[in-house]
């Protein structure tokens, strides 16, 4: 849903600023760039199957604070960041109209590598669940996109699935 229905950049910006502010820390553009570098590397390692998602989310702020010499609990910070991210509900333009149209003609499903609690919260807050037949989240399945095992699991759990008539819409050529 990030980058396809929701504006992840806006949600991330909101969550970063709110979490830093709540901890009385200044989020400068330089700090954000360092975070993005660390986060991007971790997600790339996740996509390659080198690390799991828990390692991604629970080490990025630990690494950031260590690099910056900031005495802050990165794990607790991550929990607060995820809560704030889960409340960053910014739909992309025309998302509802597209969902309304497509859901009347096709069965829609969510397939995501996002953090489960964050994804469920945003779908609920935006009342988007009604458009989807099911939600497939990598941390619940045990395999991440784009691993074939992830998609095989999804396909097995979709009644009357036909890959010749299916379309997956994503925001990344490396993870979708």
Where are these regions (language model features)?
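An amphipathic alpha-helix signature
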Residues: 12-17, 54, 58-62, 116
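Conserved Rossmann-like nucleotide-cofactor binding loop
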Residues: 4, 11, 116-117, 174-175
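Substrate-recognition element of Asp-dependent hydrolases with the DxDx(T/V) motif
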Residues: 76-79, 84-88, 95-124, 132-138, ...
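A metal-dependent, Asp-based hydrolase signature
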Residues: 41-80
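Active-site neighborhood of HAD-like aspartate-dependent phosphohydrolases
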Residues: 1-37, 67
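Short acidic capping loops at alpha-helix termini that bridge into adjacent secondary structure
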Residues: 27, 73, 130-134, 162-166
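Conserved Lys-Pro-Asp/Glu-containing loop-to-beta segment of HAD-superfamily phosphomonoesterases
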Residues: 144-176
């Amino acid at each position: 849903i990030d980058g396809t229905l929701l504006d992840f950049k806006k949600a991330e910006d909101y969550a970063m600023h709110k979490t830093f502010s709540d901890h009385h820390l200044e989020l400068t553009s330089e700090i954000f760039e360092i975070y993005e570098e660390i986060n991007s590397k971790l997600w790339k390692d996740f996509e390659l199957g080198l690390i799991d998602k828990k390692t991604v989310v629970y080490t990025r702020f630990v690494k950031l604070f260590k690099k910056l010499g900031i005495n802050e609990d990165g794990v607790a910070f991550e929990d607060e960041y995820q809560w704030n991210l889960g409340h960053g509900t910014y739909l992309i333009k025309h998302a509802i109209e597209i969902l309304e149209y497509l859901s009347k003609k096709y069965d829609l499903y969510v397939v995501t590598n996002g953090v489960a609690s964050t994804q469920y919260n945003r779908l609920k807050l935006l009342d988007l669940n009604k458009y989807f037949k099911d939600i497939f989240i990598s941390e619940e399945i045990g395999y991440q996109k784009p691993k074939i095992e992830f998609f095989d699991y999804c396909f097995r759990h979709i009644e009357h699935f036909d890959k010749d008539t299916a379309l997956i819409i994503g925001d990344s050529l490396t993870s979708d």
